[in-house]
């Protein structure tokens, strides 16, 4: 390993540690969420959006970040398609809600290291999905303000047990 590669690896390792263990879920990864359960989580998230007159895109990924289910409501901005997927992937891969990344980044200082983490999306709206105490995937929402995305993601995540 070259010295440059070692330095990059060290910086990325330190950046990951800087996220704070309190924000990382201690849950182990489990088997991937079923398509049936992914659809249920998405339906609950979109029902929350409809109730509030918001348009959203929802994505459900497995623990590795592979897309399991996706749906975009009519008139949702096109940019929200990939953002919802990326929020879900970030939540699954880093075992924490994207709101935790957003909060760490907002504090500045060491929190700025989040920007060096590949695939980390520091914007509220991505939440790991827990079933039987294990992370089986994650949900990501985009289309509204980040707190609206988070509210819909929470509604979807809450039905997975």
Predicted segments with their positions:
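Residue-level signal for beta-strand positions within conserved beta-sheet cores that form or flank
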Residues: 4, 19, 54
């Amino acid at each position: 390993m070259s010295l440059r590669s070692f330095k990059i690896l060290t910086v990325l390792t330190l950046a990951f540690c800087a996220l704070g263990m309190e924000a990382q879920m201690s849950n182990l990864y489990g088997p991937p969420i079923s398509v049936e359960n992914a659809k249920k989580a998405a339906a609950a998230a979109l029902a929350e959006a409809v109730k509030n007159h918001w348009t959203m895109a929802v994505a459900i990924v497995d623990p590795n970040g592979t897309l399991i289910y996706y749906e975009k409501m009519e008139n949702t901005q096109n940019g929200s398609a990939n953002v919802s997927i990326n929020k879900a992937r970030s939540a699954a891969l880093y075992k924490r809600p994207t709101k935790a990344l957003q909060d760490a980044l907002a504090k500045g200082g060491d929190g700025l290291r989040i920007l060096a983490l590949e695939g980390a999306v520091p914007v509220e709206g991505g939440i790991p999905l827990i079933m039987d105490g294990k992370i089986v995937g994650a949900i990501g929402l985009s289309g509204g303000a980040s707190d609206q995305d988070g509210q819909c993601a929470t509604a979807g995540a809450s039905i997975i047990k």
